Amino acid sequence: MKQLLQQLLVQSLEVLMDNNILESMPENIRVDHSKDKAQGDFASNIAMLLSEQAQCSSKVLAQKIKANFPDSVDVEKIEIVGPGFINFFMSQSSNALVVEDIIKQGGNYGLSNIGMGQRVLLEFVSANPTGPLHVGHGRGVAYGAAVAHLLRAVGFEVDCEYYVNDAGRQMDILAISVYLRYVETEQFPDNCYKGDYIFDIAKKISGVKKLDIFTNTCKDTSEWKVQKNSIDKERYIDDLIANCKLQLGSDYRKVFDFAINSILSDIKIDLADFGVEYHQWFSEQSLVDSGLSEEIVKKLQDLGYIYEKEGALWFRTTDFGDDLDRVVVRDNGIHTYFSYDIAYHLGKFERGYDRIINIWGADHHGYIARVKASIKALNYNPDKLEILLVQFVNLFRDGKKVSMSTRSGSFITLKELREEVGNDVVRFFYILRKSTQHMDFNLDLAKSKSNENPVFYIQYAYVRICSVLKQGMPFMADIDLLVLNNELETLLIKELNRYKDILQSSALNYEPHVLACYLRKLAGYFHSYYNNCEFLVDDDKLRNSRLLLITAVQQILANGLNLLGISTPNSM
């Protein structure tokens, strides 16, 4: 209906142009759903936007637009309100058409080709493989998966990618943590990884010892040259890593790989069990092995953007909008994570995607400027890269906040959360709020079977419709949707009419919470309808029309939940 109104407005404006009231047609004519039913079904502010061009007040221009608006059986009346808003009241017959369209199109209703097949690379989660995915990561998982589904629904081709941070110091700390548990040392550094999963990996190593995983294993670490009483904990862990590498020789890499692969395997299983699939798993180590990061630094040097200070190589990111210059090669010759990120993002651009989207935790906000600076320095358009931020999650149990830390091993894993409350609840709770807002995950509410639990509330609406339709299906030959004229039926039909716009808005603005809130509202309208109206009445036309209406509601609930990765149970 929005498209129809836009077309009719164009025809009205063309008449005004022919009469020299307007000089040009605007590029975009905005028509929105009215928030207040008393103000009609749709509204447009076009008169206020064009009043200066027309050299008259917006209210006068609105009246002229109305006077030249083409007759349409779909538009019952037009009102001018306020400074010049144009409100449209649609006819009952035009509103009711949505029910038939939904029934005809089924699972395809709402899908579009706005994206026109543009290729999108969507990177999300990319958590360090230093431990299992926890509840903090889960929000990025659910959000990224929902964004991917929504973009595909409006015609984009989306590839999902996970960037595996399998190189660098944190991976060395993981390896030394596993090895120290393997050799059962009594003194375990505070800044090693302490979770039970470290013990589990160490036990796995013991289990494969028969396969000769080690040739240089020595469980005596007393001779290692480390400053055990050093106040500098970071220096202490670096000494441990250096001694472990020296002691194990080539076997160190076996520990390193075994630890990372064990965790990465669990992450992949966890994501698959959560219903999330990736097209690519991109290894940071591949950038090290290929020498690509060195090539990038050399290229930046040739462009004059690298300078040396205190033995390190610095990238002049301030020339491209960053607030500070950044180190790309430390004074010890080791490349920084940033240098690998530059190489990784350059590779993304070279793969030919139309859009590149990163979903990062909100704590990476300060990283955006330097990454975009590197893209600009390498002569690519930084606006092609969109970075979406996901805020932190606080988990509450019995009204108390659950403290979590990956390094200390004190955290609730995503798997544990899913097993406690179920995939559907976890997904929906994660995306119910705008991703840039902090989120409190209430475990008690998540486990409740009440109307306050939004997942239960929506799925229960779907189940109720299933129950009604088991007692009688609509007979299509005996339907007259114009008999659906009570207030609750009108509300439901108008809400169904909003679905296409909600879907497009959710997709193009990367806001799955908009669709989630819509589904909760639609479910609420249905529950009111269910509690106040009978469906299996004696009047054939009324019975069949009501059954058709709730069938359409059921279809939209299914379509929306499917896009969010939520199931539609037939019974509860």
Curated annotation (Swiss-Prot):
Cellular location of this protein?
A: Cytoplasm
Keywords for the protein's UniProt record, in alphabetical order: Aminoacyl-tRNA synthetase, ATP-binding, Cytoplasm, Ligase, Nucleotide-binding, Protein biosynthesis
Q: What molecular function does GO assign, one term?
A: ATP binding
E.C. number, please?
6.1.1.19
**How is this protein organized at the quaternary level?**
Monomer.
PANTHER family to which the protein is assigned, alphabetical: ARGININE--TRNA LIGASE, CYTOPLASMIC, ARGINYL-TRNA SYNTHETASE
Family to which the UniProt record says this protein belongs? Belongs to the class-I aminoacyl-tRNA synthetase family.
Protein's name according to its UniProt entry: Arginine--tRNA ligase
Q: Supply the source organism for this entry.
A: Vesicomyosocius okutanii subsp. Calyptogena okutanii (strain HA)
